[in-house]
């Protein structure tokens, strides 16, 4: 079996820095370990006041880095129960313990830009160590007072058509990307980071909560290659780390974001992937601490833990924290208690559909299930709302007709329904879009589309201006002008093929179906 210290994401050296980052231990806070059960450590103190809840403890270990733990319960007048934030290999009863006199404090400011940090703010990349005098902030902090908070009613344009049209994000608000495994949540979050840097020149703070080490490494390399790392802070608590580390990573990211909001008056994009792993880590911690589980095995404090995290994500006068959260939906069950608890706090719900991903409709965002409180005429304008409602109505009606089409064929529909089906399919394809972050894999340049161009394109499709276009001309394009050029090129290619066939004396065996953009035998109909 691999050494636990060797398998930890940042290694023994990083853990050593972790322990030193919480400050010097106070002499009166000396104690000793009396029990160790996995990540749970019971500590007895000989005299004086016990360490407060959430206070950090350091435990030296012979031949290894000190262990950092956090107090979570007072067992008696002389004993506390703490949760280790790192591997407990090598720890034994009787080991000395020091209380630090306060919660974990993490580095903030310009020094952390472009860096990858652990839950305690220790560098986990190949960069230089942080200066000893770098400013630090505690990870535990209350939300701003209600009188200081600013409502989120300004549009946060992303350049992603389907989001901007049907589930617009609020600057200073909270949005969540809900989806099962493999439907594109992380790619969508990466594209939003790219959009933030390109459009707003703001600060991005990324919290990697319980995700794969490989994905974290790839994200670091991608950001270096794209040039956005210099205005980004990465905070990782990966899936191979103890539950305490994964549980506290969002708080570390929040502390850094709050510094740039409060002290620098800078807009911050806070991205968290994956918030479900935060809930999952909390369930592990709850079990380790001996609490009885609630529904589906979740911790009894699920609602309060999610609320404590989400309520700290707030905007104040002069600066906004815009949160975009990826949320894994276990078994695609949107009634899961963790999913419903998170959904109650967000302004915009972006729902990713496995069925759309299977059809290649990327981003695989469900236009019917996604929603936003910003889709209001007073915020985005009447024209935007009218087009969004009509797009949703047409696609929803098409879905209602799909069973009839599958059983009886499209010919059994009336003329109006056939026309609606064609427009719905074209709308679905127009709402697909190539991403800048996938350009290296697809070979197609990413497209960022203004909201006005998205509305104009959807209105033209709804009006019937594109009824005789190939569906393929609208697939993976930016604006309608891009689709128009694609359609013109396809028609020119068809004309050349027909001319060549006529010159060679070939018969009219096949024709290119203008609706689908594919060659089909004469008499075949689109929509089978």
Swiss-Prot record:
Biased composition (Polar residues): 1-10
Stretches the record annotates as Disordered: 1-27, 488-528
Residue spans of biased composition, Basic and acidic residues class: 15-27, 488-499
Pfam families: ATP-synt_ab, ATP-synt_ab_N, ATP-synt_VA_C
GO CC entries: plasma membrane; proton-transporting ATP synthase complex
Enzyme Commission no: 7.1.2.2
Topology class, membrane: Peripheral membrane protein
Enzyme kind, highest EC tier: translocase
Keyword field contains Transport: yes
Protein's organism: Burkholderia pseudomallei (strain 1106a)
UniProt keyword RNA-binding present: no
SUPFAM superfamilies: C-terminal domain of alpha and beta subunits of F1 ATP synthase (SSF47917), N-terminal domain of alpha and beta subunits of F1 ATP synthase (SSF50615), P-loop containing nucleoside triphosphate hydrolases (SSF52540)
Quaternary structure note: F-type ATPases have 2 components, CF(1) - the catalytic core - and CF(0) - the membrane proton channel. CF(1) has five subunits: alpha(3), beta(3), gamma(1), delta(1), epsilon(1). CF(0) has three main subunits: a(1), b(2) and c(9-12). The alpha and beta chains form an alternating ring which encloses part of the gamma chain. CF(1) is attached to CF(0) by a central stalk formed by the gamma and epsilon chains, while a peripheral stalk is formed by the delta and b chains.
Gene transcribed to yield this protein: atpD2
Membership in a protein family: Belongs to the ATPase alpha/beta chains family.
Annotated residues for binding of ATP: 179-186
Any one GO molecular function term: ATP binding
Protein name (record): ATP synthase subunit beta 2
